[in-house]
């Protein structure tokens, strides 16, 4: 159960979801034609050890990420989501943006993967123990970032704007923001404050990329929670205990109303466009995927 001031490392609470997602990206990268190839996802899993290291080594056949009714689709989802936001950042790079802010950066490796313009700084905001795990894993692997990387240890439910500026962020210059895999772990009022902070800190010409998950109807949410608990799948049960299923602002509309040119792509449409098999409406993955949209916007 979440509390207003809970915190975590890479193995607990919200932090543990980063390993689940990294493992998905690692499995996607092994496909003959991956939607995205994150070479560092496997590094994180091996550094975590245990089932994560075994999974990327080809073991743990019963792992939820190998299941036919959910796992195979979730792996494709992570490939699609990664590709979408990699492409989004490519547009920001082409526009000359040299300030990048990744909120709840987790095990995001874009500071190491993408070809940033010289002079770019990637600001990564997350819990201190998450930063520590990521830094140590990449250092041991000998990885070198392709931009200046600035770690900011902060709770995104609090005022993080000052901490960002203290690290050298300049609100008078354009920036590119990423809100990926975050909003469902925030209460609705915290999301509102997050959007307001981005808008206040972003100069004209700035970009924002957001993953949005529509609130489930109460009856659907109760059904999904009951199904997760009955399945014995601890990861699935934990997911529903971590998220806030609250009515909240729709991202594309919010930013459009605040002077941004925004566009929204439904995840199912993007997966279909990418040539991936979609889950059937009777499968658990369908309820999740049908509620997810990918948003990008540019500030006028």
Curated annotation (Swiss-Prot):
A UniProt-annotated Pfam family: LCM
SUPFAM superfamilies per UniProt: S-adenosyl-L-methionine-dependent methyltransferases
A molecular-function term among this protein's GO annotations: methyltransferase activity
Statement: the UniProt record of this protein carries the keyword Electron transport: no
GO biological process: methylation
Superkingdom of the source species: Bacteria
Residues engaged in binding S-adenosyl-L-methionine: 126, 155-156
Protein biosynthesis keyword on record: no
Keywords: Methyltransferase, S-adenosyl-L-methionine, Transferase
Enzyme Commission code(s) on record: 2.1.1.-
NCBIfam families documented for this protein: mthyl_TIGR00027
Function comment: Exhibits S-adenosyl-L-methionine-dependent methyltransferase activity.
Family note: Belongs to the UPF0677 family.
Name recorded for this polypeptide: Putative S-adenosyl-L-methionine-dependent methyltransferase MAB_4328c
């Amino acid at each position: 159960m979440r509390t207003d001031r809970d915190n975590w490392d890479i193995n607990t609470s919200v932090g543990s979801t980063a390993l689940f997602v990294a493992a998905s990206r690692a499995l996607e990268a092994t496909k003959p034609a991956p939607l995205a190839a994150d070479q560092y996802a496997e590094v994180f899993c091996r550094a975590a050890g245990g089932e994560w290291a075994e999974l990327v080594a080809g073991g743990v056949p019963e792992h939820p990420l190998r299941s036919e009714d959910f796992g195979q689709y979730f792996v494709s989802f992570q490939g699609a989501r990664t590709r979408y936001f990699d492409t989004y950042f490519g547009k920001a790079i082409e526009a000359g943006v040299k300030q990048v802010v990744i909120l709840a950066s987790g095990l995001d490796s874009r500071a190491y993967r993408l070809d940033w313009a010289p002079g770019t700084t990637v600001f990564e905001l997350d819990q201190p123990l998450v930063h520590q795990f990521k830094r140590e894993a990449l250092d041991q692997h000998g990885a070198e970032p392709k931009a200046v990387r600035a770690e900011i240890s902060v709770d995104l439910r609090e005022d993080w704007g000052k901490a960002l500026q203290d690290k050298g962020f300049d609100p008078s210059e354009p920036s590119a923001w990423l809100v990926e895999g975050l909003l469902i772990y925030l209460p609705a009022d915290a999301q509102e404050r997050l959007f307001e902070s981005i808008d206040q800190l972003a100069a004209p010409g700035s970009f924002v990329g957001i993953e949005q998950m529509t609130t489930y109807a109460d009856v659907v949410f109760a059904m999904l929670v009951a199904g997760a608990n009955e399945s014995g799948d601890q990861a699935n049960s934990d997911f529903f205990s971590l998220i806030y299923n609250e009515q909240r602002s729709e991202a594309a509309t919010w930013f459009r109303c605040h002077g941004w040119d925004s566009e929204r792509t439904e995840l199912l449409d993007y997966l279909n466009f990418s040539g991936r098999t979609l889950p059937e409406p009777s499968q658990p993955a369908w309820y999740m995927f049908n509620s997810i949209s990918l948003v990008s916007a540019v500030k006028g």
